[in-house]
Structure formats: structure tokens, C-alpha cells
UniProtKB/Swiss-Prot annotation:
It comes from the Eukaryota. One of its GO terms (cellular component) is HAUS complex. It comes from Drosophila melanogaster (Fruit fly). As part of the augmin complex, plays a role in centrosome-independent generation of spindle microtubules. The complex is required for mitotic spindle assembly through its involvement in localizing gamma-tubulin to spindle microtubules. Residues 141-163 form a coiled coil. This is Augmin complex subunit dgt4.
Amino acid sequence: METPPTPTTTTPPSLTTEGTMDDIQYLLHLEAMRRFQEDSRNVKRQVEEQVRIWLDAKCEYQRDFGRLARLLKCGALQAAVDAHRVSDVNQVDQAAKDIASLRSKLGSDLRPAILDSNDVKQCLEHLNTTHKPRLNLCRQQREFAQNQEALRSLRTAVDGLENGMEMGMIQAMDRLVEDLLPPRETNN
């Protein structure tokens, strides 16, 4: 004997179609909201990126502007100092002669000297007998490292000196400008 099917509650076909349409509209609405939020996040990220790029460019511009302003101040101070200094005519003439001599030597195609064959042979013998590059390599590497460290220290010292000189020149220029300005009137 077969058992009859169990009764289930079913919705009328008109409600099923309407419910399905509402569900589809709701899902479309959710998808649209998700896309809107995603687009909003993308726009916000792009705006933040452009703001960061703009701020970087602004900082670089301000840094370059400050450097140029300091250079202009230093140039103005140099011009003011040069205006008060008398140049030595003998030094200028000697420098012109030295430049002309160097120009003629560099412009000529003549070889400066011809090597003596005996000197070349003696040098080759010296290289073959006494020159030991492997033994000197460790010493040269150590000296190179010391020279590199000294160079770094020297660069640091030069940077500090340049900064100090620049600050001194700026202060001197400010004092010079204050001295050149007419005195301020005070109302008592």
C-alpha cells in the first residue's frame, strides 16, 4: 500500500511571482549599493592619492624655492662684497695668460713626450720581479676602506661647513640690509 503524499503548504502562483520580483529588485538594489560604495571608496582613494602627490610636489617646490632664495641672497651679498672690493689687475692678467697657455696646449695635437725604450724595459722588469699584486691587494683594500670612511667624514664636515657658511652669509646679508635701510621712526 502506497502512502499518500504529505500535504505541504504552497503559495499561490501569483504570490510566488510577485515575491520573486521583489527579491530580484531587492538584490539589484543591494548590488547597486555595493557598487556605489565600491565606487565611493575608489574615488576617495584616488583623491587621497592625488592629495599626497600634490603635497609632495608642494614640499619639493617649497624646498627648491627656499634653496633658490638662499642662492639669490648669497649672490646679492657676493655682488655687494665685490662692489666694495678692488680687484688686482696683475692677478687678472696672469689668469688670462695661464688660460691662454692651457688652451694652446690642449688644442695642439703634439704628443707631450716620447718614452725612452730603456725606461720602458726597466719598468717592465720592475713589474715582473718586484710587483706582487696579490700581496698588495689586502693592504690596498684596507686603505681603500679607510679612504672611503675619510671621504664620508669629509663630506659630512663639508656639508656642515657649507650650512654654517650659508647661515653666516644670510645673517651678514640681513645685517647689511638692516644697515642700508633708513632708520625706523619711533613715535614717543
